[in-house]
């Protein structure tokens, strides 16, 4: 079956050729299907993330774009030119790897200038371009340092500088921040986004971290079992997922099996809820509830619409928020995340408490498989 995608983003003019395009790309390793007729377009200047769990095919697709793998079937084009069998060194792309791949016997400057030496550019040209690339990643003063003298974040900046030193139109990144600690990773995400906006190079970024993809991307393509499940802007995927996999994988979500009871209503257990949009006539159906959109009502609240009851199983303090795990109807669990705000007078429920929950109709998302 051809794997088409639902794209909610507009990028580039309708007459503009995609910077990168995969057409009916399939990749097999023996009997294993790593990519199943994938179609993807990346417009010039976009940063698109390939997001998915381990084994979803995202790195395989990136390696096909890089030329490290050849598709079993299908075509890869850059700016309308067929690149399917073109070797990696002739594709004119910058690549940033997960583990930096820096040369330990070279200085920072020598590492960054290496792609230019391979291209046999003049010494003065290499020196000027190296300094410019290091300045771009804010490592001007590190040109003569050895790699072993650098922190993880500095090594990643050197890898970025090496990828951009020859000013490629296309940059590929394979989980470049996964080896960094959480605080540094989040800081580098902002730096990467700012760098992308300055360079305006088309960038394809592989990650399994949905928050990282939401932070960085103009568009996200969500993959699972070698297929693109949905492609669109971060807001499209978060607010309007097209299937249960995307709804569950992107964001913190409770998935509840429901039954259609009307054009805009569903039911689970003895609870009937109004929905924001027309419920598809399909089976199975799931109500995808974002943790931050499910509200715990005050005990004296008189709210009635889209209200249901449960019992707190666990209450977990997470610093800026409380996370509540609540049993509904004995066999269904939902999760609620509530921010801890200054001046908040509501008493936070604790384990064993009975609570009433409210899901506004505008926050309902109903999806199928």
What is each model feature region?
Residues 74-82:
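Conserved ABC transporter NBD signature motif
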Residues 59-62, 158:
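ABC ATPase nucleotide-binding domain helices that frame the ATP-binding cleft
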Residues 253, 263-369:
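Non-catalytic connector elements of ABC transporters
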Residues 51-53:
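The feature captures the beta-strand-to-loop junction immediately N-terminal to the Walker
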Residues 66:
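Helix-to-loop junction immediately C-terminal to a conserved catalytic motif
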Residues 47, 88-94, 98-245:
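ABC ATPase nucleotide-binding domains
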């Amino acid at each position: 079956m051809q794997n088409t995608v639902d794209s909610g983003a507009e990028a580039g003019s309708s007459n503009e050729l995609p910077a990168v395009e995969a057409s009916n790309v399939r990749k097999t390793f023996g009997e294993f299907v790593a990519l199943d007729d994938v179609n993807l377009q990346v417009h010039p200047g976009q940063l698109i993330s390939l997001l998915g769990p381990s084994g979803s095919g995202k790195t395989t697709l990136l390696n096909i774009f890089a030329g490290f793998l050849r598709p079993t079937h299908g075509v890869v084009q850059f700016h309308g030119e067929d690149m399917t069998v073109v070797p990696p060194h002739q594709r004119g792309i910058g690549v940033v790897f997960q583990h930096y791949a820096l040369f330990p016997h070279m200085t920072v400057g020598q590492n960054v200038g290496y792609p230019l030496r391979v291209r046999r550019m003049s010494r003065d040209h290499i020196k000027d371009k190296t300094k410019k690339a290091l300045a771009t990643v804010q490592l001007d003063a590190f040109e003569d340092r050895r790699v072993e003298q650098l922190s993880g974040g500095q090594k990643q900046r050197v890898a970025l500088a090496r990828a951009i030193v020859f000013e490629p139109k296309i940059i590929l990144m394979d989980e470049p921040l996964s080896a960094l600690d959480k605080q540094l990773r989040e800081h580098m995400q902002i730096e990467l986004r700012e760098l992308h906006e300055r360079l305006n190079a088309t960038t394809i970024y592989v990650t399994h971290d949905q928050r990282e993809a939401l932070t960085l991307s103009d568009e996200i393509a969500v993959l699972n079992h070698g297929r693109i499940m949905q492609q669109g802007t971060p807001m499209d995927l978060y607010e309007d997922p097209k299937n249960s996999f995307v709804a569950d994988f992107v964001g913190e979500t409770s998935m509840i099996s429901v039954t259609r009871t009307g054009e805009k209503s569903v039911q689970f257990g003895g609870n009937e809820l109004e929905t924001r949009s027309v419920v598809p006539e399909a089976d199975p159906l799931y109500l995808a509830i974002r943790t931050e959109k499910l509200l715990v009502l005050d005990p004296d609240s008189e709210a009635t619409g889209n209200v249901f009851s449960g019992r707190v199983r666990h209450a977990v303090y997470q610093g800026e928020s409380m996370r509540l795990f609540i049993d509904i109807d004995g066999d269904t669990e939902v999760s609620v995340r509530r921010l801890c705000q200054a001046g908040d007078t509501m008493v936070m429920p604790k384990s064993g408490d009975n609570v009433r929950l409210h899901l506004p109709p505008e926050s309902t998302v109903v999806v199928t498989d």
